[in-house]
Amino acid sequence: DKNRIANDPAFQRTRENGSEFGRAGKGGKVIRNAIRVLLQNAKDKRVVSRLTKILVAVTKTDAVNERGLRTIEDGDMNTLLGFEFNINGKLGATLFAPYATAYDRVAGSVDLDIAAFAPTVRIAAPNGTTHFKIVMGASELDFANEASVFESSETAILPYNGADTAPIDLSVALTANSVLPVVQVAGVEFYQEVNGQMYPLKNGAFNALSVV
């Protein structure tokens, strides 16, 4: 029963796991709230549970705190690299243009650079796509206080054709000398032009967003 799980020494491991799972769940909410502006355009129905699962894995890499007290921020945040927020439109299966990311913790600057590329060659777009844009965001995550700072940048809506884009350089500024964990995300959003109006393609079902 509940009381026994809460107090019986035999359930010590269960309590420790539950404590860390709860922390991972709250941490997932911090991340989702932080990047909400971009996440609302690119997510699947299971993103909450998938994100919690990988944050449990991050927690397990914490070599500082004892079991049951391990935290996300003391774990290896690189475990999150490549996490896809929409399994129906993975960035890794969408954007094939080489890109470079950079984070200068002293200055607080976060960058995404993509050399000029031909969209129809380097982007695997869903049927019906006429236009797209590249988005990038970065967030300082204060898990202990369930707070965050978020900034984002994006290209204009660009034509999906065979002509090379201009080089893309997206940059945002976070707090200089921050001691908090920082997560950077990048994505592609698809559009369909109808009578001069831009509409999110299939309500964003195939938009991509990933931790980079």
Give short role names for the model-derived ranges.
Residues 59-203:
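Charged linear interaction tracts used for macromolecular binding and regulation
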Residues 14-15, 47-49, 131-135, 155-157, ...:
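Short, low-complexity, polar/charged sequence segments that are solvent-exposed and flexible
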Residues 200-212:
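Low-complexity, polybasic segments enriched for Lys interleaved with small residues
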Residues 1-89:
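Long, polar/Ser/Thr-enriched low-complexity segments
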